[in-house]
């Protein structure tokens, strides 16, 4: 109690508890809720005032300023509000001209005058939270309304992820405290993995103490097996090296004889060059033992030639994993601005969700990606949407998942978007496409050894929005648009003879589709064609037999129309991500996959960060601990 003249101020210590208790009762009874959050298809009705009072993300979103971290659908992995998605979805409009313009991207919907972004974030009443698990969101919301959060080793990672995405540092702190208190001999490996994934340095150090204590007691055979294990017991090759040094130093007189054998099992090229100098070369036996000297020298030489690393891959430079992951690169979101995405996302099949891996050096859509020795090449595309190809590019970049780094490579000789690119032996090929001059027939070949581009035999006809695949040492190109006309053509390129040959046409004209190879068959999936002046989704799936030069229509059509999806083959299925459905008049954020052996379609859980058309997909091996993009 305090006095000021005739006035008295009395503090009620129970008021805050009573207020929180009252808000919790309103939440439990679903009274006066004014916003709905959706995660993994599960809805949570909440109060904006509660969310904004605890979360910097929601405080920004519900104010007149865009949210931190790039806004809705930005770098923090949040999807666009449902209200915004619905307003952004273009409605199919009857064409105003008698024929498609020659340079227009065929099958790509134009923005309707009615397409508008939300002008007031306060109007947002429905939010789809991409990258948030329903379990994690439920537990975080319980904390907001009760000040208590229920944690276990099975749920703490999901709660931690949601707290970081939504910028709720109090929950993050509780998760870290829980992990630090729970570390034991039985669970330190699991805790160490979670700590590495989320950059929790203090927790990682505490967990590593248990690991080191265990490792020091191993005999030589057990230590050798540990260094060969997949996945590795620690998150980095440097940590594995330091662990090996500790084991050797623990009984130097007896164990130092094993140093060359153990060092051969380390992958020194996975350690960045500065750390090789500062932390590896400084260890005495790495300088004095001939075997160890050579291992260090080989790694340093590898780092000296970054532009040729994809040609010098060996066990010493490969990621310690054998599990390929599905990647989605770039793409064009809905909306009148039509600025392509610069996100690279990967699908976490354990968590059943898409997560942001990294950011490209530029925005891009209608580009191509090619995997080469687990490096990801990103070629061409357009950094702004323009129906005449005005913003087509000739950029070539290479992404290294080991160090989460990009380098720029020599550009293509021509700007091109809506083309096809592939790898064949020691070369990359880029075929057709479009730019400001129109449709292209040119074909360029990039030598992976010499880092140079050259022209090879052109396509018989200019083509854009076609699909391609590599089979048995030859390149197949199907469909596309030729001077405004959709075509069913199939061409085959022989790189040895440098000649193109016409093959049996598809049964259906189509463009902006996909062509994938599985079990010696080519599968043409998705796309659209014109009927009069209307775009129609192609629902039929066709299968081509290269030996018999014959197409067959499969009994199982695609689940829904998809023009311009990303496409990749992983294990026994063909994956299509995003794209545009003409029948639904909507950009897609979901992922569907087709299993040729079973003849079935399924839809994956979890959507990408925002609906996209014109992205590109690939499969690569990622490190065992993939940190979230910061």
From Swiss-Prot:
Database matches in SMART domains: BACK, BTB, Kelch
Specify the BTB domain's residue ranges: 33-153
Q: Where in the cell is the protein located?
A: Cytoplasm, Cytosol; Endoplasmic reticulum membrane
Region span, Disordered? 69-117
**Domain BACK, chain residue ranges per copy:** 212-281
Keyword Zinc listed? The answer is no
By its UniProt entry, which InterPro entries does this protein fall under?
BACK, BTB-kelch_protein, BTB/POZ_dom, Kelch-typ_b-propeller, Kelch_1, KLHL14_BACK, KLHL14_BTB_POZ, SKP1/BTB/POZ_sf
Positions of Kelch repeats = 325-374, 375-426, 427-473, 475-520, 522-572, 574-622
In which domain of life is the source organism classified?
Answer: Eukaryota
* Alphabetized UniProt keyword annotations: Cytoplasm, Endoplasmic reticulum, Kelch repeat, Membrane, Repeat
Under the cellular component aspect of Gene Ontology, which terms does the record hold?
actin cytoskeleton; aggresome; cytosol; endoplasmic reticulum; endoplasmic reticulum membrane; neuron projection; neuronal cell body
Biased amino acid composition, Low complexity: 84-96
What is the annotated tissue distribution of the protein whose record heads this document?
Expressed in the brain, primarily in neurons. In the cerebral cortex, mostly expressed in layers I and II (at protein level). Also observed in some neurons of the corpus striatum (at protein level). Expressed at high levels in the hippocampus, including in pyramidal cells of the CA1 and CA3 layers (at protein level). In the cerebellum, expression in Purkinje cells is higher than in granular cells (at protein level).
User: Subunit notes for this chain?
Assistant: Interacts with TOR1A.
Name the chain's protein: Kelch-like protein 14
Species for this entry: Mus musculus (Mouse)
């Amino acid at each position: 109690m305090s006095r000021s003249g005739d006035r008295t101020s009395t503090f009620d210590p129970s008021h805050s508890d009573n207020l929180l208790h009252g808000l919790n009762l309103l939440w439990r009874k679903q009274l006066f809720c004014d916003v709905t959050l959706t995660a993994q298809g599960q809805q949570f009705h909440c109060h904006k005032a509660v969310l904004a009072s605890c979360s910097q993300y929601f405080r920004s979103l519900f104010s007149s300023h865009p949210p931190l971290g790039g806004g809705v659908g930005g770098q923090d992995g949040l999807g666009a509000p449902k209200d915004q998605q619905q307003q952004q979805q273009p409605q199919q409009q009857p064409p105003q001209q008698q024929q498609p313009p020659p340079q227009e991207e065929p099958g790509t919907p134009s923005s309707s005058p009615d397409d508008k972004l939300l002008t007031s974030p306060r109007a947002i009443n429905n939010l789809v939270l991409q990258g948030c698990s329903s379990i994690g969101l439920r537990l975080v919301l319980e904390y907001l309304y009760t000040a208590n959060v229920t944690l276990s080793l099975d749920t703490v990672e999901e709660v931690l992820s949601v707290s970081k995405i939504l910028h709720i540092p109090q929950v993050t702190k509780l998760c870290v405290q829980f992990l630090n208190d729970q570390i034991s001999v039985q669970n330190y490996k699991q805790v160490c993995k979670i700590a590495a994934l989320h950059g929790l340095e203090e927790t990682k150090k505490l967990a590593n103490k248990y690991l080191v204590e265990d490792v020091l007691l191993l005999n030589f055979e057990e230590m050798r097996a540990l260094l060969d294990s997949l996945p590795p017991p620690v998150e980095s090759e440097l940590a594995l090296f330091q662990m090996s040094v500790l084991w050797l130093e623990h009984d130097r007189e007896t164990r130092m004889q094993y140093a060359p054998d153990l060092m051969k099992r380390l992958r020194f090229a996975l350690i960045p060059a500065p750390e090789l100098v500062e932390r590896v070369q400084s260890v005495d036996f790495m300088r004095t033992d001939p075997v160890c000297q050579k291992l260090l020298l080989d790694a340093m030489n590898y780092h000296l030639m970054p532009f040729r690393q994809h040609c010098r891959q060996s066990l010493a430079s490969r990621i310690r994993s054998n599990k390929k992951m599905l990647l989605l690169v770039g793409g064009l979101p809905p909306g009148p601005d039509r600025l392509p995405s610069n996100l690279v996302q990967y699908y976490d099949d354990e968590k059943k969700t898409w997560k942001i891996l990294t950011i490209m050096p530029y925005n891009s859509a209608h580009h191509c990606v090619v995997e080469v020795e687990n490096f990801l090449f990103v070629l061409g595309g357009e950094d702004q949407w323009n129906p005449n190809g005005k913003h087509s590019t000739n950029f070539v970049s290479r992404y290294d998942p080991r160090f989460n780094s990009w380098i720029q490579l020599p550009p293509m000789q021509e700007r091109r978007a809506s083309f096809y690119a592939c790898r064949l032996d020691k070369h990359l090929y880029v075929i057709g496409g479009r730019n400001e001059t129109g449709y292209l027939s040119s074909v360029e070949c990039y030598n992976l050894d010499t880092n140079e581009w050259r022209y090879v035999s052109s396509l018989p006809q200019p083509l854009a929005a076609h699909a391609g695949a590599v089979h048995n040492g030859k390149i197949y190109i199907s469909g596309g648009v030729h001077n405004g006309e959709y075509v069913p053509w199939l061409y085959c390129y022989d790189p040895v003879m440098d000649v193109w040959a016409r093959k049996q046409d598809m049964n259906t004209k189509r463009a902006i589709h996909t062509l994938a190879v599985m079990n010696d068959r080519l599968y043409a999936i998705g796309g659209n064609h014109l009927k009069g002046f209307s775009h129609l989704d192609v629902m039929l799936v066709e299968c081509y037999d290269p030996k018999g030069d014959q197409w067959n229509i499969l009994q199982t059509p695609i689940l829904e129309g998809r023009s311009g999806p990303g496409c990749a083959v992983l294990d026994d299925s063909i994956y299509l991500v995003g794209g545009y459905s003409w029948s639904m008049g909507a950009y897609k954020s979901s992922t569907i996959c087709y299993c040729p052996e079973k003849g079935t379609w399924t839809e994956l859980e979890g959507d990408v960060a925002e609906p996209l058309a014109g992205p590109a997909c690939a499969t690569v091996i990622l490190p065992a601990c993939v940190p979230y993009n910061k």
